[in-house]
Amino acid sequence: MKLSHMLLSLASLGVATALPRTPNHNAATTAFPSTSGLHFTIDGKTGYFAGTNSYWIGFLTNNDDVDLVMSQLAASDLKILRVWGFNDVNTKPTDGTVWYQLHANGTSTINTGADGLQRLDYVVTSAEKYGVKLIINFVNEWTDYGGMQAYVTAYGAAAQTDFYTNTAIQAAYKNYIKAVVSRYSSSAAIFAWELANEPRCQGCDTSVLYNWISDTSKYIKSLDSKHLVTIGDEGFGLDVDSDGSYPYTYGEGLNFTKNLGISTIDFGTLHLYPDSWGTSYDWGNGWITAHAAACKAVGKPCLLEEYGVTSNHCAVESPWQQTAGNATGISGDLYWQYGTTFSWGQSPNDGNTFYYNTSDFTCLVTDHVAAINAQSK
């Protein structure tokens, strides 16, 4: 998801005690999530799973706030939470704002301090405690929280698309991947490592992203062969049941089926935003089933990883959930995005957010999870 602006000021949320990362050996299970044919397996159960997104949880500065979210997810039986594993800056903040990596003058500095990766440490620790599984990505296509452009700016590349091929940038990117993966490679709370949030390479030959995906996923597997790896793309570039609309074309440099066939990619992802893409809401059902068919053909499960609208959440998104749940090849969905109320106020609302214990939450979480559980019996 591309955010329209910075939605969360974290300097004012209090300061938490941040300790060096240590695994929580009291986690609900030590079994790592995996795939089984066209399905996911979590905690020994193979099937379809519901979840959500929270880009902001790793930027909270109060541990109690993180625990509140995780406890609500666990109580709601939302098994998977996708979080931002990046927070790139070109200038070091001085106001207490959380940041993970500084890019400046051709160098990159990883922040492992209390206002850096120790905040992500606590997200993993809390996820272990509450039995939630995390998808952690490493960089953003968009400029929110720095993104690829932060690298491009610091290393003097000509265009954002150079991120994928610039040797110095890729070395810094891989160094960050190594830093994050090495912190959590022993944690059963990790569902998957994700190359990026919505990677695109507009106007590029599809070989550019294919080669980058192949190389990066192979590198991640060399660091951690036990966890799943995925791309984090929107599902663009698909010739299965194509209606010729832009998302099906290769204009963003992606070939969904070919990329999914890479041996070091364990499952596929797709996103769904008709309001942003200029398509109808009903169009989304075909988008889901087309990807399900592609996933089935490749023999790997796919995850409807992001989907959202700004109004009429239940009426619009519930049919998508039903379509995904009934489609062979799709094994889970994560709505965008989770919302809750803290002691200091509500979590960010980018327009797609709906909040815990509201009528939309009942429709799209409580009822949805109940339907999944009923179907799996």
Swiss-Prot record:
**Keyword Hydrolase: yes or no?**
yes
Instruction: Name the Gene Ontology biological process terms.
Output: mannan catabolic process
This enzyme's EC code(s): 3.2.1.78
Stored Gene3D superfamilies: Glycosidases
- Family membership, please give it: Belongs to the glycosyl hydrolase 5 (cellulase A) family.
Tell me which species this is from: Aspergillus aculeatus
Q: What is this protein called?
A: Mannan endo-1,4-beta-mannosidase A
The residues the record assigns to binding substrate are: 84, 197, 273, 336
Q: Which gene encodes it?
A: manA
Provide the temperature dependence entry.
Optimum temperature is between 60 and 70 degrees Celsius.
Relay the pH-dependence remark from the record: Optimum pH is 5.0.
Q: Which residues form the active site?
A: 198 (proton donor), 306 (nucleophile)
Q: Where in the cell is it found?
A: Secreted
Top-level class of the enzyme under EC nomenclature: hydrolase
GO molecular function terms listed in the Swiss-Prot or TrEMBL record: mannan endo-1,4-beta-mannosidase activity
One GO cellular component term noted in the UniProt record for this chain: extracellular region
- Which keywords describe this protein according to UniProt? Carbohydrate metabolism, Glycoprotein, Glycosidase, Hydrolase, Secreted, Signal
